Every structure is written in C-alpha cells, then in structure tokens.
C-alpha cells in the first residue's frame, strides 16, 4: 500500500512538473515574438534567435532569459511588474533586451506587455538621480503590495548615492512605522578588474543594516536561482525588501545556465551544495563562499585536480540559513579544515557580519576546527585600480583558499 501511494505521488509530481514545463515553454515562445516586418538589430536578433532555441529546449537558459521568464510568469499569475533604473530596458551589460527597437523605423516593442496588457508591465530608463528614483520606488512599492517593483543600479557601486533612502526607509521603515515594503534592488556586484568605482555594491553595508528579519540579502549564481528568487519575492505573502548582489560577467558564464526543467520544478535554494561532489567521506577541506567567487574557485580546483575539496555556496546571507548550511556541512564530517572565501577585502563583504554565523554552523560537526579566512586584505577603497594588481590579489587568495 505504501509503495502504491509513493508511486501515485511520484506520478502526480511528474505530471505537475510536465504541466509547468509546458506552461513555461508557452511563455518563453511568447517572449521572443515580434510584430510582422519588425527588423531587429543584428546582435539583438542573435539573442532572440538563441532565446527561441532555449524555449525549444535546444540549448540551456541563460541569465537574461531566465529573468524575463520570471517576469512573464509573475505577469501570467495576475501580478504586475515595474522596473526602473538608468539602463534597464537593454540592461547595463546588454543582457535583458526587454525593450527592442525596429532598426528602420525606431519603433519600440516590449514583449512583456503581451501578457496582461500594457498596464501590467512598466519599464523606465530613469534619470541619473539614484536617490530620487529609489525614494519614489520605495513609496510606490509600499502602496502596491501585489506588484514586483524593481530598482536596478547601473553598477551596484552607485547605490551609495541613495544611501539615505536605504538607511532611513528600506532598512528601518518596518521597525519605525510598521510599513511593509516588497521593493527589490538589483545591484551589479563582482570583482572583475574594473576598479574601485565599478566592483562593489557594498554588501557589508546591507549586512550591517540587517536585523529583526527586516530585509533579505541574496547572491544568486544560476539562471534557475534568479528565476525562483524573483517569483518568490512577489508570490510569497511575506513582503520584505530584497537586496540582490546581481552579476556582471556571470550573465554570460557557461556554468550559470539552467534547463527549463530546473525552473519548472524546485524553488529558490538558500544554500547550494557542490555539484561536483564525489564521495563525501574523502572530503578534507570545506570552502564556503557567496557569489561569483564560486566559479573562480571551482575552475582553479578543477585545474589542480583536487578531489578532496568541496565548495558550498550561500545564496542568501540574510536571514542567515543556519539549518540548511548545517545539514549540507554534516555530510562532510571527515573534513579537517573549513574556510570562508570572499573576493572583497577583509573589512568589506560578508566576513565581519557572517563569521559568527559560520562558527555556529560548525559547532555541531566541526567544533574543534578553526574557521579560516581567504580573501583580499583590508582596504580603504573597494577594489584595486589596476587590472594586473586585481589579478595578482585574486590568484593569492584563491591559492590560500585551496592550499
């Protein structure tokens, strides 16, 4: 009887996933439709052609299309979506293309307005005052609880021009006035040699502001993760601001892609175990990290052919996922060292505000071990100004993490 019930439940789940997959494919195909005779610019046409292949499951889904699919899915469930920022129609790094233009006439076309009518999806390339736009979007999102309201910084670094809005309203508004707000901030963040003004969304500031479950701080590292995260933000009945350290180079990284099936099933995972995990009993070193640095560590580990090193990703830093992290770490009980690795300098990033949480997660299985740090040395500026210095710093801390 138990076996029959188990089989029946499994069949139901498979049918449910199949239905969701069919629905997603329908949304995906609708996203690449353009009016008859509409002439796309050459590179944009290539992106849309690739997206049609993604819709047909010929190639995996990249970040830009996963994000668009999340919006389409939210719209088809009857919610509205609103996006503002200095270059959001195209996306600062040319990944979104939510607005496309006819190469001959200059006419604009917005595929996401085909889902629930043009009133349900709004996207505006806004003026260059971060404080003004973010303040307006905060007010808008507090009064429109069923909308997915997003403000995207051109680079995460520029959010500091709106620090007053973040401190006075977004982080503390619920505590001061019991005003709930579901605003989402997409802040491109990542150390890629572009210097101190184009590397850091100042993750440490958001973590310092975190208390009483006031905000969520996430660093998604795959297409499926960003899809589930954005859907969860509006479909979950709890309204909290969502701060996302969004990617730059990862937008086109071959390892960040996901299948449509991964989007049709599952949910946002606050902790990701290593996809390359082998026999857990042979693991001697655990590295815990967040964001892009996972792919830098993973590439170097493969390069050195290290089979006894595991890399665990924290996709959410606040609220801290204690139980999820402890349960993943428990599998590697034979490990002899635990390291936190970050690409930010020691006085920045997650180290200062997260190390006590990491030590707590170690207590049950690794109480006798000391938590190690691997990352850049403390710095007054967010990042090095010279690409060569950036690379030498990265090689040094990746080496420290893996040795």
Show which residues each predicted segment covers.
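Non-catalytic terminal/interface segments that mediate subunit docking, oligomerization
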Residues: 18-146, 151-174, 260-312
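Generic secondary-structure signature for well-ordered alpha-helical cores
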Residues: 29-36, 76, 170-175, 208-212, ...
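Acidic, glycine-rich active-site loops and adjacent beta-strand->loop/helix elements
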Residues: 88-90, 153-157, 187-192, 223-224, ...
């Amino acid at each position: 009887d138990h076996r029959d019930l188990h089989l029946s439940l499994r069949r139901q789940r498979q049918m449910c996933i199949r239905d969701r997959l069919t629905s997603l494919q329908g949304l995906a195909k609708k996203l690449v439709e353009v009016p008859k005779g509409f002439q796309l610019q050459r590179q944009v046409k290539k992106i849309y052609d690739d997206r049609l292949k993604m819709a047909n499951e010929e190639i995996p889904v990249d970040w830009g299309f996963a994000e668009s699919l999340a919006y389409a899915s939210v719209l088809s469930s009857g919610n509205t979506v609103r996006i503002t920022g200095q270059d959001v129609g195209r996306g600062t790094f040319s990944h979104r293309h939510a607005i496309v233009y006819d190469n001959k006439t200059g006419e604009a076309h917005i595929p996401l307005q085909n889902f629930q009518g043009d009133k349900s999806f709004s996207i505006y390339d806004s003026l260059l005052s971060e404080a003004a736009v973010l303040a307006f979007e905060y007010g808008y999102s507090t009064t429109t609880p069923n909308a997915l309201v997003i403000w995207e910084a051109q680079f995460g670094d520029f959010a500091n021009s709106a620090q007053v809005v973040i401190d006075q309203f977004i982080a503390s508004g619920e505590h001061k006035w019991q005003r709930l707000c579901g605003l989402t901030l997409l802040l491109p963040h990542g150390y890629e040699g572009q210097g101190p003004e184009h590397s850091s969304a100042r993750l440490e500031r958001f973590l310092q502001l975190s208390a009483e479950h006031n905000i969520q701080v996430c660093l998604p590292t795959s297409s499926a993760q960003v899809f589930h995260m954005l859907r969860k933000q509006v479909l979950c009945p709890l309204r909290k601001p969502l701060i996302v350290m969004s990617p730059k180079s990862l937008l086109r990284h071959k390892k960040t892609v996901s299948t449509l099936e991964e989007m049709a099933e599952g949910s946002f995972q606050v902790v990701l175990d290593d996809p390359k995990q082998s026999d857990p009993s042979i693991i001697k070193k655990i590295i815990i990290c967040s964001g892009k640095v996972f792919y830098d560590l993973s590439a170097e580990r493969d390069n050195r052919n290290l089979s006894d090193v595991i890399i665990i990703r924290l996709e959410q830093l606040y609220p801290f996922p204690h139980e999820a992290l402890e349960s993943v770490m428990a599998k590697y009980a034979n490990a002899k060292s635990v390291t936190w690795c970050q690409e930010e300098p020691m006085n920045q990033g997650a180290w200062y505000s997260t190390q006590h949480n990491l030590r707590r997660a170690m207590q049950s299985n690794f109480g006798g071990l000391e938590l190690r740090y691997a990352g850049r040395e403390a710095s007054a500026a967010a990042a090095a100004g010279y690409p060569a210095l950036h690379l030498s710093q990265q090689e040094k801390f990746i080496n420290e993490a893996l040795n």
